[in-house]
Amino acid sequence: MVTWNGQTVLLNWATAEEIDNYGFNLYRARVDDFSLAQLIHFEPSAIQGGTGSGATYRYLDMPPVQGTWWYWLADIDTQGIQTVYNPSVAIAVQFQTQIYLPWMGKR
């Protein structure tokens, strides 16, 4: 699940079971094209030894500019093989800005 809170993008995911799982890579791009995506984060497996029950994960991302961003999750097994999960997830990011104008009044 991906949500925008006005300042950061929150990415949440969960696993039912992790067998031989080393960790996860998160990727981000401005378009829905994985070949243009950049690795933004590695999250190690929360399961000791890469075997056992599942876990929940979260990552806070701060996109450099507003617009639509696409995210991909990939898992890496203990042999170093990466599996990218589709579909990608898109979210529109719009920074909230406040403009302060000087107060001008009659004296």
Locate predicted features.
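Structural beta-strand segments of beta-rich domains
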Residues: 7-11, 22
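Short glycine/proline-centered coil/turn motifs in the loop regions
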Residues: 5, 16-20, 65
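Extracellular fibronectin type III
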Residues: 76-98
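Conserved functional hotspot residues at active sites or interaction interfaces
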Residues: 102
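Beta-strand-rich modules
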Residues: 61-81
